[in-house]
């Protein structure tokens, strides 16, 4: 191993690092970013960062090897062109939603697929997932379901009190 080029060692480290990230992530989405400006990519990175997600741009060969090492399948024929991987560490839908919003805003951004719950998701499934509210939105919906009956009782009691007060 003494004659191994430093670039090969570096690439192996990149593959191992990315494979670990993919294994520990909740979900990730692969998309072709060709045509996005630096400002667009920075804005996407900021949105992803706010939900504890990250954007990685790697060579396709390194990405393919990381997928293989992490046990990810479904992207075998998808890694052509300049691709990026948005990885969600906490909220499963956050990265998928952010990239899907960018793809809807810019027609030239092509989503290749996503990986969620150890399954490949195609673009049709991604559209369905992106329609789901985020974790905070779901919490607020759940909270409103709990508070609605109490609110109705309060309004009823207030109406009865007003009638008796007249």
Swiss-Prot record:
One of its GO terms (molecular function) is structural constituent of ribosome. GO terms for biological process: translation. One of its GO terms (cellular component) is large ribosomal subunit. Part of the ribosomal stalk of the 50S ribosomal subunit. The N-terminus interacts with L11 and the large rRNA to form the base of the stalk. The C-terminus forms an elongated spine to which L12 dimers bind in a sequential fashion forming a multimeric L10(L12)X complex. The keyword Ribosomal protein applies. This is Large ribosomal subunit protein uL10. Forms part of the ribosomal stalk, playing a central role in the interaction of the ribosome with GTP-bound translation factors. Keywords: Ribonucleoprotein, Ribosomal protein, RNA-binding, rRNA-binding. It comes from Ureaplasma parvum serovar 3 (strain ATCC 700970).
């Amino acid at each position: 191993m003494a004659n191994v080029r430093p670039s090969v060692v570096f690439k192996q480290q990149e593959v191992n690092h990315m494979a670990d990230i993919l294994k520990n992530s909740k979900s990730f989405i692969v998309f072709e970013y060709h045509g996005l400006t630096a400002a667009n990519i920075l804005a996407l990175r900021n949105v992803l960062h706010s939900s504890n997600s990250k954007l990685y741009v790697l060579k396709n060969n390194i990405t393919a090897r990381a997928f293989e090492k992490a046990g990810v399948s479904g992207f075998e024929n998808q890694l052509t062109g300049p691709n990026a991987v948005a990885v969600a560490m906490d909220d499963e839908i956050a990265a998928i939603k952010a990239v899907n919003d960018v793809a809807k805003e810019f027609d030239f951004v092509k989503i290749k697929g996503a990986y969620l719950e150890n399954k490949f998701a195609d673009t049709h499934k991604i559209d369905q997932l992106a329609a789901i509210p985020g974790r905070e939105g779901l919490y607020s919906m759940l909270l409103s379901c709990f508070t609605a009956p109490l609110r109705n009782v309060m309004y009823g009691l207030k109406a009865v009190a007003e009638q008796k007060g007249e």
